[in-house]
């Protein structure tokens, strides 16, 4: 259970770093937003889901 918690925490830290780099690149590229909108929304949604997963796993571990 602790390994799942550690992986979820690592992913919830890694995804925002990827989004911080990826979103400005998408917005700066020509025709980038219309073609990559789903990828940006998927990354943001997965980060929100990981925040809830970390909270649930934290309550199970403690």
From Swiss-Prot:
Q: State the compartments where it is located.
A: Plastid, Chloroplast thylakoid membrane
One Pfam entry name: Ycf9
Cytoplasm recorded as keyword: no
Q: How does it sit in the membrane?
A: Multi-pass membrane protein
Provide the transmembrane region boundaries: 8-28, 41-61
The answer to whether the entry has keyword Transmembrane is yes
GO cellular component: a single term: photosystem II reaction center
Which GO biological process entries does UniProt record here? photosynthesis; photosystem II stabilization
The record ties this protein, via SUPFAM superfamilies, to:
PsbZ-like (SSF161055)
Its main subcellular localisation, reduced to a broad class, is plastid
Q: Which UniProt keywords apply?
A: Chloroplast, Membrane, Photosynthesis, Photosystem II, Plastid, Reaction center, Thylakoid, Transmembrane, Transmembrane helix
Q: Which proteins does it associate with, and in what oligomeric form? A: PSII is composed of 1 copy each of membrane proteins PsbA, PsbB, PsbC, PsbD, PsbE, PsbF, PsbH, PsbI, PsbJ, PsbK, PsbL, PsbM, PsbT, PsbY, PsbZ, Psb30/Ycf12, at least 3 peripheral proteins of the oxygen-evolving complex and a large number of cofactors. It forms dimeric complexes.
List the PANTHER family hit by this protein, alphabetically.
Answer: PHOTOSYSTEM II REACTION CENTER PROTEIN Z
Its annotated function is as follows: May control the interaction of photosystem II (PSII) cores with the light-harvesting antenna, regulates electron flow through the 2 photosystem reaction centers. PSII is a light-driven water plastoquinone oxidoreductase, using light energy to abstract electrons from H(2)O, generating a proton gradient subsequently used for ATP formation.
Q: Which family does it belong to?
A: Belongs to the PsbZ family.
> Could you tell me what this protein is called?
Photosystem II reaction center protein Z
């Amino acid at each position: 259970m602790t390994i799942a918690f550690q992986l979820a925490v690592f992913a919830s830290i890694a995804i925002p770093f990827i989004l911080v780099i990826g979103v400005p690149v998408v917005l700066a590229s020509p025709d980038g937003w219309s073609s990559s909108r789903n990828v940006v929304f998927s990354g943001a949604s997965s980060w929100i889901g990981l925040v809830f997963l970390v909270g649930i796993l934290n309550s199970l571990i403690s």
